[in-house]
Amino acid sequence: MANRGGRHARNEESDNTINYVQCDGLAVMKMVKHCHEESSNMDLAQGALLGLVVDKCLEITNCFPFPKSGDETMDEEMYQLTVMRRLRRVNVDHLHVGWYQSSDVGNSLSLALLESQYHYQTSIEESVVVVYDTQKSSRGFLCLKAYRLTPQAIQMYKDGDFTPEAFRTLKVGYESLFAEIPIVIKNSPLTNIMMSELNELLPEDKGHNFLDLGTASVLENHMRSLIERVDELYQEAVRYNKYQQVVFKQDTEKHRALAKLAAENAVRTSKGEPTVPEEEVIKQFRPMPVPARLTATITSGQINTHAQHIAQFCSQSLAKLFITESLQNAKEAKETK
């Protein structure tokens, strides 16, 4: 991931820098190939997106993978500059417009993703992150989504304040950290002609796989990930509850000490002696540091994503079950005649 710095002006309204992303078919194939190659090694695939901005459309025309983090001799920033310089020499779009990464079972939202996109978006205003879900795509559903940080999330990360008060002030929740940008895939006319010719050469699909109900592993993976995220959120809730208990105990002791001081000052006043200022008592109780809620917010977003995927998967499975039952009943009725 790139580590970029920059300035970003606060914008309370929605981000209208990019309305949609148009991705070239060749760039999509490169991303898909790279992500599937790395998924076999259980590694996270990441790479740079190249293209240009036309009006409100971000056109992605090329991409290249980042070097693996295990190679300590590789300077990642120098590697990216070298690749873009060589692409420029051969008259290929070389402008950096974002980055992409692979995802497994919908586990795309993370602290690392938020941090990297913040550095990108504050230095390259129109940059996006494209997330490719390898497991869902391997089942026949191309899952390619583009995201940008919302202005509120950028301001929160810029301030470095992740307390509950900051989340309430900026009205930031897990659903408003990222904004999904519509993405379309465009091919050249020659590519479309070639795809039409190849489609005629493919054998006709009888459609048996569409009613396949043996997909328990998919639901199992989603449920396992969901249980892990719920456990993490529970641990975060326990930590925050302990913080609230400590703060409540400290406030109780401080009020008791102030009440005692007020009584002592009343006695001193009646005797004509100088009173002790309240600051002497208050400074004995240092305010407790408020725990950051960013991790809990991200975990909540992951739980919401898994719940949506499970609901979608179950609805599709139920639809397959009813269709299969109807076809089976029709087949049995036909055989009895």
From Swiss-Prot:
- A Gene Ontology MF term for this entry? translation initiation factor activity
List each copy of the MPN domain by range: 21-153
Protein origin, superkingdom: Eukaryota
Subcellular location(s): the record lists: Cytoplasm
Checking CDD domains in the record gives:
MPN_eIF3h
The record's annotation in SMART domains points to: JAB_MPN
Q: Biological process GO annotation list?
A: formation of cytoplasmic translation initiation complex; positive regulation of Notch signaling pathway
Alphabetical UniProt keywords = Cytoplasm, Initiation factor, Protein biosynthesis
PROSITE patterns according to UniProt: MPN
Pfam families, per the entry: eIF3h_C, JAB
Q: Name one GO cellular component term.
A: eukaryotic 43S preinitiation complex
Q: Which InterPro entries match?
A: eIF3h, eIF3h_C, JAMM/MPN+_dom, JAMM_MPN+_peptidase_M67A, MPN
Q: Does the keyword Protein biosynthesis apply?
A: yes
Q: Which segments of the protein form a coiled coil according to its record?
A: none
The family note in this entry says:
Belongs to the eIF-3 subunit H family.
Matches recorded under PANTHER family: EUKARYOTIC TRANSLATION INITIATION FACTOR 3 -RELATED
Q: What does the annotation say about its assembly with partners?
A: Component of the eukaryotic translation initiation factor 3 (eIF-3) complex. The eIF-3 complex interacts with pix. Interacts with mxt.
What HAMAP family does UniProt report for this protein, alphabetically? eIF3h
The protein's job, in short, is: Component of the eukaryotic translation initiation factor 3 (eIF-3) complex, which is involved in protein synthesis of a specialized repertoire of mRNAs and, together with other initiation factors, stimulates binding of mRNA and methionyl-tRNAi to the 40S ribosome. The eIF-3 complex specifically targets and initiates translation of a subset of mRNAs involved in cell proliferation.
Name the chain's protein: Eukaryotic translation initiation factor 3 subunit H
- To which species is this protein native? Drosophila ananassae
Q: Lineage of the native species? A: Eukaryota, Metazoa, Ecdysozoa, Arthropoda, Hexapoda
Chain's gene name: eIF-3p40
